[in-house]
Amino acid sequence: MSAGKIVQIIGAVIDVEFPQNAVPKVYDALKVEEGGLTLEVQQQLGGGVVRCIALGTSDGLKRGLAVKNTGNPISVPVGTKTLGRIMNVLGEPIDQKGEIGAEETWAIHREAPSYEDQSNSTELLETGIKVIDLICPFAKGGKVGLFGGAGVGKTVNMMELIRNIAIEHSGFSVFAGVGERTREGNDFYHEMTESNVLDKVSLVYGQMNEPPGNRLRVALTGLTMAEKFRDEGRDVLFFVDNIYRYTLAGTEVSALLGRMPSAVGYQPTLAEEMGVLQERITSTKTGSITSVQAVYVPADDLTDPSPATTFAHLDSTVVLSRNIASLGIYPAVDPLDSTSRQLDPQVVGQEHYDVARGVQGILQRYKELKDIIAILSMDELSEDDKLVVARARKIERFLSQPFFVAEVFTGSPGKYVSLKDTIRGFKGILEGEYDHIPEQAFYMVGSIEEVVEKAKNM
């Protein structure tokens, strides 16, 4: 193991000088002897100097401090010992429950599986959330993005998905908190404990208050743990909240490393960094990784380079809309903007496909009629259009649903609705079976039977 010394410190970026014959490789982990801070080599500048990012605060560092080269990339504990534990970017426990005690550690930088090892699946993963199962169904082993601006419900949707899938699907999950609020991480931990699923989840946090190096690498730490479960032949769920903060951390590091920024100030390597992460999130012939990623949309602009780069990698996109949230309809999923590759009659079956497209057709027609209604009022519409509007408003309300994880706020018990019941309910509305029921009865309920029951008491 070679030793060097710190020659320059600029925030989270540290330059270390080594003897010319013992320069560390890119991605090698270095350890500052005083204080034990870990650095990761990013560039070799020549003359024995390497430029590193600090995986921890650089407060208290000074030039001349001794640095040791470990000779290997950052390695983190993997396997079943990580379940039920909270770890940081280096795989160190931060839940005061003692050592992880894993038998094996894996490097966080790994190659994506080769083409011949990868496999495709068209099997659906039922989430119990009506709007998602109907309009943008998830594939087992697929990638899902939850897109939304600030405060429209990305984290709540993700917590509900984890709760439903962990309880109904009973597989292992890995949750990577990338640059999000520490309070949410804490809420999430307690939510998992109360639902008795904590022993099936590994939690890796690199939150908002941490240096950019931690936020950039924590997604890879979580992914490495998920890959281990997959390679043991399991079907694992990998949740990332929030993929935008991963990009943002890359932007901060890129600027500190002296690279020229590209569009909107993002790093020039944006597409490559996203690809490195996303290509590893894949299913192989041994096991599968199903990933759900929350994607913050800056200023509600889906054409921003960061969400736009993410779109390309996903099988399903769930778009959360501020307009729908302002109507008080939660989950605020936009049924006209959300898409899924699985919504194909050969995958979901003809009935599901027809009902989903029928729902979208009626909502699209209602959207077109809104201008006419605003100018001329409902009375000017034809009888057919009045019927479309009435059914569309019922569908809009029936797409809302009380969540288990939001019981504290809403006061209504959460509902899990099977795909069969979801299709049956929407099919009934489309065919006019519930035209006699007032639209208020469709708001914040589970299955269609509850609507009928609610209408009786109105």
Curated annotation (Swiss-Prot):
Molecular function terms from GO: ATP binding; ATP hydrolysis activity; proton-transporting ATP synthase activity, rotational mechanism
Membrane topology label: Peripheral membrane protein
Top-rank taxon: Bacteria
Subcellular locations according to the entry: Cell inner membrane
Keyword hit for Cell inner membrane: yes
SUPFAM superfamilies listed in its UniProt record: C-terminal domain of alpha and beta subunits of F1 ATP synthase, N-terminal domain of alpha and beta subunits of F1 ATP synthase, P-loop containing nucleoside triphosphate hydrolases
Main location: membrane
EC code(s) of this entry: 7.1.2.2
Pfam families hit by this protein: ATP-synt_ab (PF00006), ATP-synt_ab_N (PF02874), ATP-synt_VA_C (PF22919)
Annotated binding of ATP, by residue: 148-155
GO cellular component: plasma membrane; proton-transporting ATP synthase complex
Keyword list, A-Z: ATP synthesis, ATP-binding, Cell inner membrane, Cell membrane, CF(1), Hydrogen ion transport, Ion transport, Membrane, Nucleotide-binding, Translocase, Transport
Catalytic reaction annotation: ATP + H2O + 4 H(+)(in) = ADP + phosphate + 5 H(+)(out)
Enzyme class, first EC level, given as a word: translocase
Family listed: Belongs to the ATPase alpha/beta chains family.
Function: Produces ATP from ADP in the presence of a proton gradient across the membrane. The catalytic sites are hosted primarily by the beta subunits.
HAMAP family named among the record's database cross-references: ATP_synth_beta_bact
Known partners and oligomeric status: F-type ATPases have 2 components, CF(1) - the catalytic core - and CF(0) - the membrane proton channel. CF(1) has five subunits: alpha(3), beta(3), gamma(1), delta(1), epsilon(1). CF(0) has three main subunits: a(1), b(2) and c(9-12). The alpha and beta chains form an alternating ring which encloses part of the gamma chain. CF(1) is attached to CF(0) by a central stalk formed by the gamma and epsilon chains, while a peripheral stalk is formed by the delta and b chains.
Protein name, UniProt field: ATP synthase subunit beta
Organism: Actinobacillus succinogenes (strain ATCC 55618 / DSM 22257 / CCUG 43843 / 130Z)
Gene from which the chain derives: atpD
